[in-house]
């Protein structure tokens, strides 16, 4: 697998792929409803992360919020000036075993 020129997949592409998958299983669901489900999923994900909840999808991975320590000598990449970065929270994703095996070709 080469990472030099990776294709960019958008939400619309995912909606199209899910729609095709559903049709291949002899089901019918309009794309607008698929988009609503995807939007609702991401709103729930964001809302739970804002509440500092850990979100686990077995075999896929875990989303959580972690605290990142601040630094005194961070550098602004655009200006080169030194700035102080305070402690802050970041969203973090930890891939699950099945995802690691599938993406990285690792057998656990």
From Swiss-Prot:
Q: Which InterPro entries match?
A: Hist_DNA-bd, Histone-like_DNA-bd_CS, IHF-like_DNA-bd_dom_sf
Keyword NADP: yes or no? no
A biological process from GO: chromosome condensation
- What is a GO molecular function of this protein? structural constituent of chromatin
Q: Which GO terms describe its cellular component?
A: cytosol
List the disulfide bonds in this chain: none
Concerning SMART domains, the annotation shows: BHL (SM00411)
* Domain of life where this protein originates: Bacteria
One Pfam assignment: Bac_DNA_binding
Print the keywords alphabetically.
DNA condensation, DNA-binding
Family in the record: Belongs to the bacterial histone-like protein family.
Instruction: Write out the function statement from the record.
Output: Histone-like DNA-binding protein which is capable of wrapping DNA to stabilize it, and thus to prevent its denaturation under extreme environmental conditions.
Q: What is this protein called?
A: DNA-binding protein HBbu
Write the gene name.
hbb
């Amino acid at each position: 697998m080469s990472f030099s020129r990776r294709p960019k997949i958008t939400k619309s592409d995912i909606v199209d792929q899910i729609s095709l998958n559903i049709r291949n299983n002899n089901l019918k669901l309009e794309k607008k409803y698929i988009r609503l489900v995807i939007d609702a999923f991401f709103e729930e994900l964001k809302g739970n992360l804002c509440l500092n909840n850990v979100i686990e999808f077995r075999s896929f991975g875990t989303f959580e919020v972690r605290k990142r320590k601040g630094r005194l000598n961070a550098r602004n990449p655009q200006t080169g000036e030194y700035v102080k970065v305070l402690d802050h929270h970041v969203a973090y994703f930890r891939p699950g075993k099945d995802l690691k095996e599938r993406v990285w070709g690792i057998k656990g």
